[in-house]
């Protein structure tokens, strides 16, 4: 593991399992305790591979729930840089165009970085770079309902396209890659992002890690 100047918490689990809600809740509450400049969220979705060389028709056929869809090398390099106190430029991904935009987001080093994404725990290299790993364990039917609503309302998707993607890639990839990665989690959180007891436990553990840096 790289020399540490920050604490990195990985939150994984199925799409629409409540990862983002847990991450944002912890972020908001620790902002009040640490200062908002000392804690930040990095999403794995930002590290989907650049597909600008492909046509739109080819991009929509990409299996975005497979580990190969991610630019893991860039994510790991950014984690290492942040732990060394270096700022990084995080890609901005477009869910409408299914590729990266030409923009980047400057992300400064923080005391606490919350890393959130479906496939984080499937990669041993990422697991080695984080201080604590969390798996949000929410029933797949609940995840599907949430994903359906989110993708139609926020990402301009049609009902049939969401259903087709769920059947062809989302569910199979969850069973093949995401669910088995639960074994690598330090903490498994049931009932998704509204599990108040689990959120409190995670905050206590983060404070413990900070105090023992």
From Swiss-Prot:
Any one GO molecular-function label of the UniProt entry: ATP binding
One Pfam family of this chain: PRK
Source organism superkingdom: Bacteria
GO cellular component: cytoplasm
BP terms from Gene Ontology: CTP salvage; UMP salvage
Pathway linked to the protein: Pyrimidine metabolism; CTP biosynthesis via salvage pathway; CTP from cytidine: step 1/3; Pyrimidine metabolism; UMP biosynthesis via salvage pathway; UMP from uridine: step 1/1
EC number assigned by the record: 2.7.1.48
Keywords: ATP-binding, Cytoplasm, Kinase, Nucleotide-binding, Transferase
Gene3D superfamilies registered for this protein in UniProt: P-loop containing nucleotide triphosphate hydrolases
Primary site of residence: cytoplasm
Enzyme class label: transferase
UniProt subcellular location: Cytoplasm
Binding site for ATP: 13-20
Entry keyword annotation includes Repeat: no
Transport in keyword set: no
Catalytic activity: uridine + ATP = UMP + ADP + H(+); cytidine + ATP = CMP + ADP + H(+)
Cysteine disulfide links: none
NCBIfam families reported in the protein's UniProt record: PRK05480.1, udk
The family this protein is said to belong to: Belongs to the uridine kinase family.
Name by which UniProt lists this protein: Uridine kinase
UniProt gene name: udk
